[in-house]
Amino acid sequence: MNAPVVGSSLMVVHDTRCDYGAPVAHAHHAAHLRPPEDDAQQVQAFELLIEPAPAQCQGEVDAFGNWRHRFELVTPHQVLQVRSTSRVTVAARFGGLRPEASPAWETVRERLRYVARASFEPAVEFVQPSPYVPWPEPGLAGLRAWAATSLTPGRPVAEAALDLMRRLHDEWAYRPRSTEVDTPLSTAFAQRAGVCQDFAHLLIGACRLHGLAARYVSGYLLTEPQAGQPALLGADASHAWVQVWCPGTPGVPADGWLDLDPTNRLVPAAGHIRVAVGRDFGDVTPLRGVIRGGGTHSLTVGVTTRRA
């Protein structure tokens, strides 16, 4: 059991509504909405409300160690509403970070290469291409060359990863609604603009194309309103950032994963709540399902993150 976490107490309400053009007779859904717990994050309370009421709902841990809820709906419906409420205490995770003291990136890359009869390194799973970060793909040929500028010979891996994050933030524009969930990564690369999902996938691709392990993080970000302005309910959104494997780096947990937020050009601290990790967005979708019936549908999502 993890020791009590001393840090910021945050409350997150995540509302999802799906309206269908015709009745749904039967549905199975999976949700990644419950935050995990570790030495820097502790869940004080979590509630999941589903309407219509599911015939069954169970929580489980998926292949990547994330909480996942599966539920079945047998009541005919044209509206599905899911609300998760989380109260989480979050502490800064990377105190004393010394990126310049991390191993050379080539040394880390060698640890991730296959060697017969060598012990298995779980981070290897996050070096390979994945559905949202594919290669070889002609439209991403330039991403490898772009990343090489940061990965100079002998450079400490955490220092290189931080430089990639900063360059990505500085050279790409954050542009809401410039891409969709299924927009190819090559489009975001070519137009030099995207949303947080694109920024995360681009940083992941830049690392993997050079043999480094990187994985996608879904979660929430506390966005403080300007002085004198009230927080807008539902104006926040789920957020995405990246973890790069930097083993042996002072200030990074023993598992070696360093969090980087390229959308905001920072190392996540007590304002970021992790929910799930995976190879890319497809592994950590907040809500997905298989339905019988329904016809056309529209999705509405609202997230409110505030201090508890």
Regions found by a protein language model. Give the residues of each.
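Secondary-structure boundary elements
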Residues: A104-G194, F281, H297, V303-R307
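A general structural signal for short secondary-structure boundary/capping elements
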Residues: V61-G65, H77, I291-A308
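Alpha-helix N-cap/helix-initiation motif
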Residues: V5, F189-A193, A231
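Hydrophobic/aromatic-rich core segments of domains that either
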Residues: A3, R166, D198-G295
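Flexible, active-site-adjacent loop/turn segments at secondary-structure boundaries
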Residues: C18, A22, A31, L48, ...
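Short capping/connector residues at structural and topological boundaries
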Residues: A25, H29, D38, A55, ...
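Intrinsically disordered, low-complexity N-terminal segments that are enriched in acidic
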Residues: M1-Y114
